[in-house]
UniProtKB/Swiss-Prot annotation:
NCBIfam families in the record: argB (TIGR00761)
Primary location class: cytoplasm
KW Nucleotide-binding (keyword) present: yes
Organism whose genome encodes this protein: Hyphomonas neptunium (strain ATCC 15444)
SUPFAM superfamilies (UniProt xref): Carbamate kinase-like (SSF53633)
Name the record gives this protein: Acetylglutamate kinase
Family named by the database record: Belongs to the acetylglutamate kinase family. ArgB subfamily.
Enzyme class (EC, first level): transferase
Residues involved in substrate binding: G67, G68, R89, N196
Keywords in alphabetical order: Amino-acid biosynthesis, Arginine biosynthesis, ATP-binding, Cytoplasm, Kinase, Nucleotide-binding, Transferase
Length: 297
């Protein structure tokens, strides 16, 4: 395209986005940020700019981030062996020290710096700040194949959200503050113990408490795929359990779908599972007719 046609294309795109900008103005959008999008410098810059644009357009983005690969690298460097059960990292005291160090430290602050460098005003915090994210010990069971007796699986300091206090987020999201919260998913128990909370689950809990217009879960696939590997554009929350039972949703997609459905059932406008590897995936989802990824409504 010529320079003029480039400009016309940009202008047309902005004009077509107007109804969606008006729809979401003043609305809270909770974004779980992680996967390849967080590890790629170009995509990280694109994400930061998109978040700043959302804020400039009148939306209230709240970012919740993961950090599994970075945690794994530091554990390896320190010689701490990781064990996984049902896709969850068994978290002993030594591992929890590393989890909190990585999530609340370098990862959180790198996202904050990127957003601030792009012109925003990001503030980093964890679920421990202001009792934002209360957690309780996660419980899992497994059935012995011989005796068929259910046994409790001890995951250590792996937690699940039990209560959310959004007062600190509300203070940051006030119109005159214009701040963008960036939350590390470290929860605190009633006894003061720290818990490693799955980032998708934490984002879903915050979205429900905030009554967010959208929960967006960024991942490394296009969205939920059917058995022919084609993207499913929309799924009613009531159908999620069926897709899990019939084997359409497998592996890591199961907890994402469960989180999406639970958030919708608890007052979130809709949840979207989309490919964070696609540049400007956030903008495509919110400001174009067909969106991006899979919508759970």
């Amino acid at each position: 395209m010529t320079t003029q046609s480039d400009a016309q294309f940009t202008a047309r795109t902005l004009s077509e986005a107007l109804p969606y900008i008006q729809r979401y103005a003043g609305q809270t959008i909770v974004v779980k940020y992680g996967g390849h999008a967080m590890g790629d410098a170009s995509l990280a810059l694109s994400f930061a700019r998109d978040v700043v644009l959302l804020k400039a357009l009148g939306l209230n983005p709240v970012i919740v981030h993961g950090g599994g690969p970075q945690i794994g690298k530091l554990l390896d460097k320190l010689g701490i062996v990781s064990e996984f059960k049902d896709g969850l990292r068994v978290t002993d005291e030594a591992t929890m020290e590393v989890v909190e160090m990585v999530l609340s430290g370098p990862i959180n602050k790198s996202i904050v710096r990127a957003i601030n460098q792009a012109g925003g005003k990001a503030v980093g915090l964890s679920g421990a700040d202001g009792n934002l994210l209360r957690a309780e010990k996660a419980t899992r069971t497994t059935r012995d194949p011989d005796s068929h007796i259910e046994q409790i699986v001890d995951l250590g300091f792996v937690g699940e959200p039990s209560e959310v206090d959004i007062s600190v987020l509300n203070a940051l999201l006030q119109a005159d503050a214009a701040l963008i919260p960036v939350v590390a998913p470290v929860g605190v128990g009633a006894d003061g113990a720290r818990y490693n909370v799955n980032a998708d689950t934490a984002a879903g809990a915050l979205a429900a408490a905030l009554k967010a217009s959208r929960l967006i879960l960024m991942t490394d696939v296009a969205g939920v795929l059917d058995k022919q590997k084609q993207l499913i554009r929309e799924i009613p929350a009531s159908q999620v359990e069926l897709l899990i039972k019939d084997g359409t949703a497998v592996g890591g997609m199961i907890p994402k779908l469960e989180t999406a459905a639970q958030s919708v059932n608890h007052g979130v406008g809709a949840a979207v599972i989309l490919d964070g590897r696609a540049p400007h995936a956030l903008l495509m989802e919110l400001f174009t007719e067909h969106g991006a990824g899979t919508l759970v409504s």
